[in-house]
Amino acid sequence: MGKDDVIESGAGGGEFAAKDYTDPPPAPLIDAAELGSWSLYRAVIAEFIATLLFLYITVATVIGYKHQTDASASGADAACGGVGVLGIAWAFGGMIFVLVYCTAGISGGHINPAVTFGLFLARKVSLVRALLYIVAQCLGAICGVGLVKAFQSAYFDRYGGGANSLASGYSRGTGLGAEIIGTFVLVYTVFSATDPKRNARDSHVPVLAPLPIGFAVFMVHLATIPVTGTGINPARSLGAAVIYNKDKPWDDHWIFWVGPLVGAAIAAFYHQYILRAGAIKALGSFRSNA
């Protein structure tokens, strides 16, 4: 039996083909009625709080690691101190896993303007919802990093405020490429983990969806921390840059917006028009109307 064939057993032991799967309708580009819905504002608040918590935990982890490995502060034990790059990657991936699990049923658990942008391009969310989500995510990120500075004021500026910047020895093109590829991996994983066709077939998939998303964030951090400090989330990069507010994070800040947005757009196109055969369906519809 092909994997696209679904067979059910009848009461008399016979078999018959199940109904064909139907994709949900695309979200409207502009849904004015949505502005009067409490569910929209509840989702926006959830995105704000989730992004605030994400930035607070992760940036605090980065600052703590740099302090623990600072030879001038920790002495001879500095080389063996701290959680290491592996621990930082786990902090980012683990928090995404937790927060997506907590907020998926309310807002979809985006916590990232690049994810929201990719889902908007795929017509999964309306323009109104996408814009409000992105604003909430950016404000939440700024507030989250602000809390880190308030609680760790002695170390925040000294250790770079957890801000993203291009590492020495790497060109802007390399940094941009790292952000594009890293965000592609993340957004592609989001599309695959939340694919309604897969969810319709396997009832356990919605419960497990946060796991591959968090793991994708973890793996991307391992690969790109040495290059850009790993952005793949424009709100994360903006929040740290605004609160730290030094020249270095702002010099190449455009990389942490252009890279993730391009990566998200490529992932949306790949999933919708290649894997889900959107281009073939559109071509077939065009031919049938010709």
Swiss-Prot record:
PROSITE patterns: MIP (PS00221)
Compartment(s) of residence: Cell membrane
One annotated Gene Ontology cellular component of this protein: membrane
Tissue expr: Expressed in roots.
Pfam families: MIP
Segments carrying motif NPA 1: 112-114
Motif window: NPA 2: 233-235
GO BP annotations listed: protein heterotetramerization; protein homotetramerization
The record's note on its domains: Aquaporins contain two tandem repeats each containing three membrane-spanning domains and a pore-forming loop with the signature motif Asn-Pro-Ala (NPA).
Protein function: Water channel required to facilitate the transport of water across cell membrane. Active as homomers. Increased activity when heteromerization with PIP1-2.
Protein name: Aquaporin PIP2-1
Organism: Zea mays (Maize)
